[in-house]
Amino acid sequence: MKVINLIPTLMLTSLIILTLPIITTLLQNNKTNCFLYITKTAVTYAFAISLIPTLLFIQSNQEAYISNWHWMTIHTLKLSMSFKLDFFSLTFMPIALFITWSIMEFSLWYMHSDPHINRFFKYLLLFLITMLILVSANNLLQLFMGWEGVGIMSFLLISWWHGRTDANTAALQAMLYNRIGDMGFIMMMAWFTIHLNSWEFQQIFLTNPKNTTLPLLGLLLASAGKSAQFGLHPWLPSAMEGPTPVSALLHSSTMVMAGVFTLIRFYPLMENNLTIQTSTLCLGAITTLFTAICALTQNDIKKIIALSTSSQLGLMMVTIGINQPQLAFIHMCTHAFFKAMLFLSSGSIIHNLNNEQDIRKMGGLYKTMPITSTAIIIGSLALTGMPFLTGFYSKDPIIETANMSYINTWALLITLIAVSMTASYSTRIIFFALLGQPRYPPLTQVNENNPYLVNPIKRLILGSIFMGFLISMNTIPHTTPQMTMPPHLKFMALAVTLLGFTVATELNNMTHNLMFKQPSRMHTFSTMLGYYPTTTHRVLPYPSLTMSQNLATTIMDSIWLEKMIPKNLTTMQKTAASLVSNQKGLMKLYFLSFLLSITLGLLIAL
């Protein structure tokens, strides 16, 4: 019992430490660089303290619940602040803190010339805090607060360079697409309020209501918006307009992971609902294939990595769809390490090449930037699921489990194709950015000797190598794993990965010196992201916006300012003038007619 009592105490201590730098900004004006180091140190201490309850949980396997502040009671709906410290939250929190610590240290180098770097660090810290609120929440209200918190912080961080039109547009896209998902989340909250009169997870899961398809569809819509699934995905590659540390934090352990994590939280309701499982599986399979196709022909290094994130999120949705939430969570944790490392490495290249992001203008960087090149190679191999790197311990079991789900053959097939494409575009990054001859200006000064650049990448390299083994060794399977399977199924994940590597290498070598005369339709489809942004952001809104503009500026003005008043007055005046102008104004003729009439009348009277 003493061990269990230590878990909530230490975890709350780490959360309180994170809030201290925010409180200092309210008490005094932090114009010096001390705030940066205070914030980084606070995250480091919080990470060190959070490791203790995680290790205690691994030893005792006892969950802890904290309910320490009652807010209000509305009729019989009790609203309180409560935390759920179980396997998911206690495992994810140290990982998020470790990655944020590395990203903040990297930001000291990457953002050193920004005049508002103190505010930038505060936003990063708030981004982390809202994600930890979401992860540790034990009720829907607290979960919704964290949900909206990561949304607003992503808006502020994506639009950090608000002088750029593209950055503002990308932030608005992220906000609007997430508002669509929030409609589903609010619908789910309303359904549970009406039918269960409770937002506490324990009561919802113990009640286990029937016919939960409607609220779970709302949850799936919310997760699709937050985790950039097909249909609500265009904001994710656009979000690359933000600073690289923002992209690293957003893609590794905060914003996009919130949707998948929420689905994992609600798996007790989903595991017996075949409609939701099938919908999740199909949505994830379509997403992972579509975004992998789009990543194959992109030239922006950050967009390639961003689309790979969306593809991996689709793979996590596939895993949830085949009723393996623990596997999806393990992949979420392992993915965080190498994805953060890939973004930091790309930021190192971009910063050293004077903001050049086109991989066609790189090359030969393995000589001038060996540490960054090593990180990109290890991260790309881990992303593809190369054996004994971090990604292997989650990706290989996912493919094995999917192979055993024989009723979902088409979803398995396109998932395998997407896994092979992952190896292809990862090889393409290595081939164009690191190998060959330099294609950047010869006077470019390349330097990676700064410890704020090198140390975070080194830490993430170690995480990308060893953390998959450590996490998988301390995870209890949700269901009984398949004990036997044919050898060709066992090696399927490795086979499709090697196939992708081989095809990408051969194609790159064959086409390196060829002129690209005219792109094919498939190439254009991939480069234009499946024409989805063009269709949804231009073709469909254009008629309605044009009609609205004409209605507001032309038709309304034409009616009120032209037809109703001036033309009506003109018509009235013309009518009156026509009535008056029947008399021609011939006075002599009128007077003569008058005299003749009087004379004739007098003669007749006499």
From Swiss-Prot:
Entry membrane topology: Multi-pass membrane protein
Pfam families linked: NADH5_C (PF06455), Proton_antipo_M (PF00361), Proton_antipo_N (PF00662)
Subcellular location, record wording: Mitochondrion inner membrane
Transmembrane segments: 3-23, 38-58, 87-107, 124-144, 180-200, 216-236, 244-264, 276-296, 304-323, 328-350, 369-389, 404-424, 460-480, 483-503, 586-606
Domain of life: Eukaryota
Keyword Transit peptide: no
Keyword Protein transport among UniProt keywords: no
Cellular compartments per GO CC: mitochondrial inner membrane; respiratory chain complex I
UniProt keyword list: Electron transport, Membrane, Mitochondrion, Mitochondrion inner membrane, NAD, Respiratory chain, Translocase, Transmembrane, Transmembrane helix, Transport, Ubiquinone
GO molecular function (one): NADH dehydrogenase (ubiquinone) activity
The reaction(s) this protein catalyses: a ubiquinone + NADH + 5 H(+)(in) = a ubiquinol + NAD(+) + 4 H(+)(out)
Record EC number: 7.1.1.2
UniProt enzyme class: translocase
GO biological process: electron transport coupled proton transport; mitochondrial electron transport, NADH to ubiquinone; mitochondrial respiratory chain complex I assembly
General function of this protein: Core subunit of the mitochondrial membrane respiratory chain NADH dehydrogenase (Complex I) which catalyzes electron transfer from NADH through the respiratory chain, using ubiquinone as an electron acceptor. Essential for the catalytic activity and assembly of complex I.
Subunit text: Core subunit of respiratory chain NADH dehydrogenase (Complex I) which is composed of 45 different subunits.
NCBIfam families associated with the record: NDH_I_L
PANTHER family in alphabetical order: NADH-UBIQUINONE OXIDOREDUCTASE CHAIN 5
Family stated for the protein in its record: Belongs to the complex I subunit 5 family.
Name of the molecule in the record: NADH-ubiquinone oxidoreductase chain 5
Organism: Loxodonta africana (African elephant)
Gene name per UniProt: MT-ND5
